[in-house]
């Protein structure tokens, strides 16, 4: 029996299962006799033919799966070598697969482009977008980003209220290896210079600890508090991530060559620098880590709907051609479309210079972008202090 194979790659998100459900629903509608298989743990599971039959999943369970964050099929960051590619092709042939849909980020797209370029069979290879980093080229924004940005915006608004009540300095380190979209997302809720985050440090702009301390000191002197959003991927003037420099050679990389940043020494070093420069100030550094990417309590409905639509569109196109699904914004609404895989594979989208006002604040244009994506800020009372 002919089949379509679906897998999930890279880091989980709050809505990646919606993309899976969209693909399942569309495949059922387009070919009721098609077998729908889910590969456990991405291409790793596919090489071992470790799959689950999703064909008979009930509508109730499909809805529950879509509303559940993180990767229902499991995930991997494996990059298949030639032996693994042969095993994948063999598995796809054994399953009589008409298409392989892989949901993930730019490394996942790169894996699919590798498979597509080496395939000699009838199988189509379609990438469905996912990443909280929002760094896939050719996309206006990416499923998973809005929900993660909503978490980060809530976190900074909450900590701003905390540090109004008990003044001091607060830094939160936010995920984002090469792009600062998630780090800058709280700018959506800024209405004036007193609203946090007061300083935003992104990988797109060179970072200096000395300049950072001067910046903090200026805000602290003006407001009596300073709340900072800092990307885990901040880089020095040479382009080297500060977290990598602090690791002193003990760098952990995944199969795609990405440095492991989350959970490193960056927060500890920033804390030390703050305490040294401002010994009498209340200073706190937190690493948000994995919390924003799949937080059950803050899943945005628009993010869910767009993720589902991306999965459905991937399945619709998978019957005729390979490619990468991207989200396009026409000025009024977001629509999925298909572009060649090599336009997305292994590439990184950065925040444009026009999104910045200097090196540590977001411009009006940048704020308009984030405001368009995130829901409005809750109506909170401005404290008396």
Tell where the protein language model's regions lie, with residue ranges.
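Short glycine-rich or small-residue beta-strand-to-loop segments that form or flank ligand, phosphate
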Residues: 3-13, 71-76, 98-103, 169-174, ...
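Short, ordered loop/turn segments at secondary-structure junctions
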Residues: 9-11, 39-44, 77-78, 105-108, ...
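Accessory alpha-helical/coil subdomains and C-terminal extensions
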Residues: 34, 99-104, 110-114, 118-122, ...
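C-terminal non-catalytic interaction/assembly regions of soluble proteins
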Residues: 244-385
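Glycine-rich oxoanion-binding loops at beta->alpha junctions
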Residues: 47-98, 107-108, 132, 143-146, ...
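Short glycine/serine/threonine-rich phosphate/pyrophosphate-binding segments
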Residues: 13-23, 46-47, 81-86, 105-113, ...
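N-terminal phosphate-binding or glycine-rich loops at protein starts, especially the Walker A/P-loop
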Residues: 1-50
């Amino acid at each position: 029996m002919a089949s379509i194979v679906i897998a999930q790659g890279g880091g989980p998100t709050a809505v990646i299962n919606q993309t899976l459900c969209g693909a399942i629903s569309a495949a059922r509608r387009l070919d009721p006799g098609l077998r729908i298989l889910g590969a456990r743990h991405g291409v790793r599971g596919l090489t071992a033919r470790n799959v689950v039959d999703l064909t008979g999943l009930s509508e109730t369970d499909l809805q529950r799966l879509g509303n559940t964050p993180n990767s229902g099929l499991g995930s991997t960051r494996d990059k298949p070598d030639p032996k693994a590619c042969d095993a994948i092709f063999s598995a796809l042939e054994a399953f009589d697969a008409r298409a392989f849909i892989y949901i993930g980020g730019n490394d996942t797209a790169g894996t699919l482009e590798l498979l597509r370029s080496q395939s000699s069979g009838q199988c189509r290879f379609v990438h469905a977008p996912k990443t909280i980093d929002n760094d896939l080229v050719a996309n206006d924004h990416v499923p998973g980003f809005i929900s993660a940005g909503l978490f980060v915006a809530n976190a900074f608004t909450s900590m701003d209220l905390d540090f109004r009540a008990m003044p001091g300095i607060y830094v939160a380190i936010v995920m984002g290896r090469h792009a600062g979209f998630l780090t800058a997302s709280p700018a959506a809720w800024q209405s004036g210079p007193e609203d946090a985050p007061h300083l935003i440090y992104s990988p797109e702009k060179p970072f200096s600890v000395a300049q950072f301390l001067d910046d903090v000191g200026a805000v602290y002197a003006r407001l009596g508090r300073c709340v900072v959003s800092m990307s885990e991927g901040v880089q020095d003037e040479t382009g080297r991530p500060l977290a990598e420099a602090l690791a002193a050679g003990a760098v952990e990389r995944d199969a795609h060559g990405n440095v492991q940043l989350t959970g490193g020494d960056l927060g500890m070093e920033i804390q030390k620098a703050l305490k040294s420069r401002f010994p009498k100030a209340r200073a706190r550094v937190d690493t948000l880590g994995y919390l924003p990417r799949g937080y059950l309590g803050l899943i945005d409905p628009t993010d869910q709907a767009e993720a589902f639509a991306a999965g459905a569109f991937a399945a619709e196109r998978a019957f005729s051609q390979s490619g990468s699904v991207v989200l396009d914004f026409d000025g009024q609404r977001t629509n999925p479309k298909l572009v060649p895989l090599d336009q997305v594979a292994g590439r990184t989208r950065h925040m444009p210079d026009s999104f910045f006002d200097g090196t540590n604040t977001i411009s009006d244009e940048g704020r308009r972008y984030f405001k368009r994506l995130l829901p409005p800020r809750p109506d909170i009372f401005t404290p008396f202090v």
